[in-house]
Structures are given as structure tokens and as C-alpha cells.
Design a protein with these regions (language model features):
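A generic structural signal for well-ordered alpha-helical segments
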Residues: 103, 134, 202-203, 225, ...
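Residue-level marker for buried hydrophobic side chains located in beta-strands
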Residues: 26, 81-83, 209, 282, ...
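Short coil/turn connectors at secondary-structure junctions
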Residues: 21-23, 65-68, 73-74, 78, ...
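Active-site beta-loop-alpha junctions enriched in small/polar residues
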Residues: 88-90, 116-118, 146-151, 182-185, ...
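Active-site microenvironment of metallo-dependent hydrolases
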Residues: 1-44, 48-54, 59, 104-106, ...
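Divalent-metal coordination cores built from histidine and acidic residues
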Residues: 2-17, 21-22, 97-208, 273-275, ...
């Protein structure tokens, strides 16, 4: 906003507050949840003009005009619109527009998004695409410039790369709020010049450096990471993680997404240890479309926090004023107060936290779960829907795992999936060798996992082993949503089904697919960067539900298997991952063999 525009805005708001010109909309007879003071103030009225709040007080009569729209709150709570402190739109497998369409029903009026998924596919032009789409939304969508593309140089090959020069360019763009999660924590604590230059460009622009410390180690490595400059972190899973971060000056982002459930463990720092809640923020990180449609978004997170014993007002603060102050936008959002955007929720019960009306930027956006505004689709360019390039037709032979011996047993390094958590285990187990090959061992839940290069058409396939998916049929599951470089991941019990699954995704331009005994039994097409659908969120959720059902048919009982599948190549979260270059021990940031000689 220019100086002239801001001058005109504040002059107008003053005139409404003084009763000299009428408000566009007033809300009467509500219970004001004043997050800035921690009070609930009854009998409150609010006057709104040009999408902003002009007056909050006991009587708004002096702001009424003949054309003023009057909303009777009926003694319901007036809650600031909810903010998601850290999230990735691409995890919903829908566009920014469709994500907004889904979450606005649940009271989300602002999101801080890190589009490092599309950045790994398209680089800076992919980020620009997301910034442009974010700018035309009916809610606030701030973009963090992705920091680690690739997330681990030398351990993976991305479709694109980003460095200090690109970060410096993006910091000039309107809509860029800061630097996305600094996932290369070894790079930070080992004083890597590129990582520190990116953080320096961000801080020079006066913006926030996002953190990502995915290690359980809280000794000198953690202290070294914090000294490097990251200002928040959402990777904590234990109360001691929250304690350490707050004591070292970081904001603790507690996440409840589709697969990550880290609020209950860390909120104990507030409820049991008496830590100042100002240093805590709620977020989702990754939410699938079916979670958004069937369970909700930030309303779900706030409600969950309340069930963990935190005061409802405090829970709301963690999703409103806290993230707003952290990112430096509290003059615009995060509270119900003059000058701020009129992002207001009407709710009958705080403990239940069921959103009945959503006002976004002064407009009634949703009521009782129904969208009341039109949100036009964003036109994606042709280049954004042609990103999957396998280079050739894959066959069952590409998914063989050749052993160093012709028969007997060998020690194998196996990725161990942990239910509801992002980290994996580095398992070392003996596996059987028959005719020079290692095959899946269904009884012990040892399956094949393959990483298929899909950006440059090299035809390269890396094969390893994984435990935890529980597949017990001749089948395969595959996805091009494969954090962070977003190649293609395939897990299966059958080499031929793994080839069918991979080739199918190559044909449709990306997505997720389940193949059972040679037949496709579930699929969601994701043609935009191989990450997002161009269809409505409800349809994507329906297809995603079909994928989950197909997982179950194949024997998988994980709570959120497609999310766990998508993280098998995330070589910045311990302990063991697979990349297009081999099997990676994340703790050592080095390669290990799948099979020992």
C-alpha cells in the first residue's frame, strides 16, 4: 500500500469512528475475544469500512447509515480470523485458490505458505506463480521464499535450484514475508556460505528466517543452528524440544496436520511448566485435501489445543496475534482492533470452536459451512502442467535389487516408517537372497522402495528397502509428491506392479496411484508440477479417499500412508531416506549402501 493510499485509508477510518461517515457493515451484540488483552468483553459492537475495522466498543449507533449492513451477533463470540503459521499448499494437492476455498469455511483468514515443493520443480518462476495466485485471494496469503532448493546439495538432484541471488530478488516482491524453513540444518551449523548468505539477504530485508531443526540432539549442534539465525521451528515433537527452542529465543510452532500430531506433547510446556504462551504458534505444516474437507483446518488445530488443557483464549492467541506479531503483520491482522482487516469469526461456543460465520476483509465469506462468495480459478500456464519426464518406459527389471551374493543372507539398511511422525528409523536387518536378488519379505514387512528420476528424463531408478507400510498383496503404490526434490517414489511387493505404477504416473503427468495385481485401483491426477490438481478440492478429496481405500485393500494400516510415502526421500529429516543418488543416512549427511558386502 502506498503512502497516499494509507493516508486515505486512515482518514476514512477516523471519520467512521467519529460518526462523520457511515460504516459499510456493523456487527452488534457480540462477545469480543480480545486477544491483545486476554479478555472476553460482552455487549460489543464493531464498525467496518472498506474491509477494515474502524470502531470496536459498546455502542456503534453513531456509525450507522441508511446503507449500512447490520449483522446481529446474538451474543456469539467475536473471534479474530485464524492464521496458519506455517504450511505448504501443495500438500493439499490443490491450487492456492482451491486451498483457500476449502479453509475459509473453517475460519482461516490468513496463511504463511512455503512453496518449496513447486520451487524444487520449477525454481524461482514456480515461486512467482504462487505469489501471483496468492495476491488475488479473498484472504491473506503471505509467501515465504523457499530456502533449501535442493534441501541437501550433493545428496539429491532437484528439478531446479535456488541460491542467495534468487532470495535477494524475491525479497523485493510484494507478498514475500520471509525465508522458508531452513531445512539444511547441517549447513547452518557448519557455517555453509550459501545458507548463511540466504539468511543474510532475508534479514537485510527486515524479514523473518524460518527454521527447521529436525534432530533430537539439543547440544552444541542445536545451539549452533540457533546462532545461525532461524527464528522459529515446527519440527519439535517433544516437550523438551519446545523448552529448548523458547529458552534460545525461537518461536515454537506446534503442528497438527494430516500426519503430524505434535501439539499434545509440546503444549505441556505451557500447561504444566508455565511457559509464556506468547512464544508458541499453531500451524498445520501439511494437510491433505480430505483432511481439509472432512475435518477442517485451523479450527481443528485450535479445538485440539483446547482439548489438551489450554485456556480457549490462549489457544486462539496461538493462531491469531502470536503469528501476526512474529511475522510483523500485527498492524494488519491477528486481532479485532481499529485499523486491522475485518477478519472476524462468529462462534457460539469457544470450547467446541465451531465456526458459524466467517467475515474476511469485511465481506461475509461463509456461513454455516457454506461459501458465500465466488473465488475464480487461477489460470496456470502450459509449462506448469508438463513436468513429469521419465525418459523411457520402465520395466520390472528396473526395480530389481541385486545382492552381493548369489544366495543366503545379507545385512540391509532399511528405512523404518514411524506412525504419525516425520522422522524414520535407520533399521539394520538381515534379508534373504535368492538367485542373486533380494525380494520383499511380506511376513516381516520389508518391502521395496524405489526413487525414479522424473525431472531430466535420465531413466535412473534407485532401489532400496522400507519397513512399516504393511502391504501384503501383489501391489505397488507410487507418487510424484516426494519431498523435497519431488522425483517419483514407488513402494511395492511386485516389481511388475511397481513398473506399471511408475509408467501410469508418467502418462498422466504426475499424481498418486495404487496398482493391485496389474490393475489400477486408485488414482489422483496431479498435473500441475506433478504436485497439484486443477480440479475442485472436494473432487480431489474424493479421489484421495479412494487412494486411501486402495492402500487399505493392499494391507496398509498407517494413519496417513500417502503422507508417509511422500517423505521417504526427504533427506533433511532423520534418520534414513532414499534419493536419486542413493540411500542417505541423514544423521551423518552421507550415503550408505542398501546391502552390505
Amino acid at each position: 500500500m502506498t503512502t497516499h493510499q494509507l493516508t486515505q485509508l486512515t482518514r476514512t477510518l477516523v471519520q467512521v469512528a467519529m460518526g462523520k461517515i457511515p460504516a459499510d457493515t456493523v456487527i452488534r451484540n457480540g462477545r469480543w475475544v480480545c486477544v491483545q488483552s486476554g479478555e472476553i468483553i460482552p455487549n460489543t459492537d464493531i464498525a467496518i469500512k472498506d474491509g477494515r475495522i474502524a470502531f470496536v466498543g459498546a455502542d456503534v449507533s453513531h456509525t450507522l447509515g441508511k446503507q449500512t449492513n447490520v449483522i446481529n451477533a446474538g451474543d456469539r463470540y467475536l473471534v479474530p480470523g485464524l492464521l496458519d503459521g506455517h504450511m505448504h499448499v501443495e500438500s493439499g494437492m490443490v491450487t492456492v485458490t482451491e486451498f483457500v476455498r476449502a479453509v475459509i469455511l473453517h475460519g482461516t483468514t490468513g496463511m504463511f505458505i512455503d512453496p518449496h515443493e513447486i520451487a524444487n520443480v520449477f525454481g524461482l518462476k514456480g515461486v512467482r506463480l504462487m505469489v501471483d495466485e496468492a495476491a488475488v485471494q479473498p484472504i491473506h496469503v503471505w509467501v515465504q521464499m523457499p530456502s533449501c532448493v535442493p534441501s541437501a546439495p550433493g545428496l539429491e538432484t532437484p528439478g531446479a535450484s535456488i541460491g542467495p541471488q534468487e532470495v535477494a530478488e524475491a525479497m523485493k516482491w510484494e507478498g514475500i514475508i520471509g525465508l522458508g524453513e531452513m531445512m539444511n540444518f547441517p549447513g547452518v551449523m557448519n557455517a555453509d556460505e550459501k545458507m548463511h548468505a540466504e539468511m543474510a539477504e532475508t534479514r537485510s530485508a527486515g524479514k523473518v528466517v524460518g527454521g527447521h531443526y529436525a534432530s533430537l540432539e539439543l547440544g552444541k549442534e542445536f545451539h549452533g543452528y540457533v546462532a545461525g539465525g532461524p527464528e522459529d521451528d515446527h519440527e519439535g515433537t517433544r516437550v523438551e524440544d519446545a523448552v529448548a527452542r523458547v529458552r534460545q529465543g525461537m518461536k515454537v510452532m506446534m503442528r497438527l496436520g494430516s500426519a503430524w500430531h505434535d501439539v499434545a506433547s509440546q503444549i505441556r510446556a505451557i500447561t504444566e511448566m508455565g511457559f509464556d504462551p506468547r512464544h508458541f504458534i499453531l500451524c498445520t505444516d501439511d494437510s491433505h485435501s480430505e483432511t481439509l474437507i472432512n475435518q477442517g483446518h485451523m479450527d481443528r488445530v485450535v479445538s485440539h489445543a483446547i482439548t489438551q488443557g489450554i485456556n480457549p483464549i490462549t489457544a486462539i492467541q496461538l493462531a491469531t496475534i502470536n503469528p501476526a506479531e512474529h511475522f510483523g503483520v500485527a498492524r494488519e491482522v491477528g486481532m479485532i482492533a481499529p485499523g486491522r482487516y475485518a477478519d472476524i469469526l462468529l462462534i457460539s461456543s469457544l470450547p467446541k470452536f465451531e465456526v458459524e460465520m466467517v467475515i474476511a476483509k469485511g465481506q461475509i465469506a461463509a456461513q454455516n459451512g457454506k461459501l458465500l462468495m465466488d473465488i475464480p480459478a487461477f489460470p496456470y500456464p502450459t509449462w506448469a502442467v508438463s513436468s513429469v519426464n521419465l525418459g523411457r518406459e520402465l520395466t520390472a527389471r528396473d526395480f530389481r535389487l541385486t545382492a552381493p551374493v548369489s544366495s543366503g543372507k545379507v545385512k540391509a539398511h532399511i528405512i523404518g516408517v514411524i506412525e504419525n511422525q516425520a522422522p524414520t528409523q535407520h533399521l539394520v536387518m538381515e534379508v534373504n537372497v535368492v538367485k542373486g536378488e533380494v525380494s520383499p519379505d511380506i511376513e516381516r514387512d520389508i518391502l521395496k522402495v524405489a526413487l525414479v528420476e522424473r525431472h531430466k528424463g535420465t531413466g535412473e531408478v534407485q532401489v532400496g528397502l522400507v519397513n512399516g507400510f504393511g502391504l501384503d498383496q501383489p501391489c505397488a503404490i507410487a507418487t510424484t509428491v516426494a519431498h523435497d526434490s519431488h522425483h517419483m517414489i514407488v513402494v511395492g511387493t511386485s516389481d511388475s506392479d511397481m513398473a506399471i505404477a511408475a509408467n501410469k504416473l508418467g502418462q498422466v503427468g504426475g499424481g498418486q496411484v495404487v496398482v493391485l495385481d496389474g490393475e489400477v485401483i486408485g488414482m489422483v491426477e496431479l498435473p500441475i508440477a506433478g504436485l497439484m490438481s486443477n480440479e475442485r478440492a472436494e473432487l480431489v478429496a474424493e479421489k484421495a479417499s479412494g487412494i486411501l481405500e486402495a492402500f487399505r485393500t493392499c494391507g496398509c494400516t498407517l494413519n496417513n500412508p500417502n503422507m508417509q510415502l511422500s517423505l521417504l526421500a526427504l533427506v533433511v529429516i532423520p534418520e534414513l531416506r532414499i534419493s536419486d543418488l542413493g540411500l542417505v543416512d541423514v544423521n551423518e549427511f552421507d550415503f550408505v549402501p542398501v546391502l552390505e558386502s
